[in-house]
Amino acid sequence: MILSIESSCDDSSIAITRLEDRAILFHKKISQDSAHSPHGGVVPELASRLHAVALPKILEECAPFFPRLKAIAVTNEPGLSVTLLEGVMMAKALALALHLPLIAVNHLKGHLYSLFLEQESRFPLDVLLVSGGHTMVLHARSFGEIEIIGQSMDDSFGESFDKVAKMLSLGYPGGPIVESYAKEGDASRFPLPLPLAGKKEVAFSFSGLKNAVRLVIQSLQNPPNEQEKRDICASFQATAIAHLIQKCRLYLATSNAPYLAIVGGASANLALREEMERLGEHFGKKLLLAPLAYCSDNAAMIGRAALESYALGAFTSPLELTVRPRTPSLC
């Protein structure tokens, strides 16, 4: 069994994964949404303090598994440095105390392997990764061969939802709230510019779109009413998704990978899933989706990725493991 820890942002999570059949024997996550909601976004220092309280509580429930553990795994990159440290320090202490090997896991690779929590691994694979911190197109040939094709030059897809929700005083996290409002809105009422429309490169930008939403709100004579909020959300979501699809289309036209996937917390957006399904059909690629329960940050996906490292004997010394807020690659 592998005990895995996730604390890269504002979710405290620990999981136990069985080596033989990849079964998840234990998984628990404590969200911090209510604590960060008044601030309209994650406050790193607050998140770190909450991890320091939540992780030990979850770990107590894992004690019965300790005698059968074969390794400890932890997210060490990328993420908020102060929150990553909470998980890494716990993992180091466990590895040393229990005399177990330590596995460092890239958080983004964890999201990729959330696809394979309930199905077999399938490669080669083109992936759209969308979360609160990242927006990327990846090409994965295997566990150790993952190429970053393109990424956002500024805000991420998920982050832009949070910021639009804050502009409209809708609350936090913004993703599910904006999606809910968009379902009842008219996307044609407030036309918004498609980012990087004339650029023939696989890259993303959401800062201009975010500013366009701000200008729409400022153009109204009064603060937006509920229907105007719905219409703004509908227009924003439709434009943001169209931007993703346009850039993915550019790359997929050049790729021979038989599989297409979408991962990350924002991949739970049903409108985006539907558009990706259509995109996959257009290019003759089978769309792979992570279970909705494992789209957001969680330790189960970290454990699943750690199984691959364990099989390769890719361990890290507890005395040498450090956190890396940014990651140059996924290999």
Curated annotation (Swiss-Prot):
The record ties this protein, via PROSITE patterns, to: GLYCOPROTEASE (PS01016)
Q: Name one GO molecular function term.
A: iron ion binding
* Positions with a binding annotation for substrate: 129-133, 162, 175, 269
Q: Which residues bind Fe cation?
A: 107, 111, 297
Give the Enzyme Commission number. 2.3.1.234
Question: Any coiled-coil ranges, and where?
Answer: none
Instruction: Describe cofactor binding as the record notes it.
Output: Binds 1 Fe(2+) ion per subunit.
Q: What does this protein do?
A: Required for the formation of a threonylcarbamoyl group on adenosine at position 37 (t(6)A37) in tRNAs that read codons beginning with adenine. Is involved in the transfer of the threonylcarbamoyl moiety of threonylcarbamoyl-AMP (TC-AMP) to the N6 group of A37, together with TsaE and TsaB. TsaD likely plays a direct catalytic role in this reaction.
UniProt-recorded name of the protein: tRNA N6-adenosine threonylcarbamoyltransferase
The gene for this chain is: tsaD
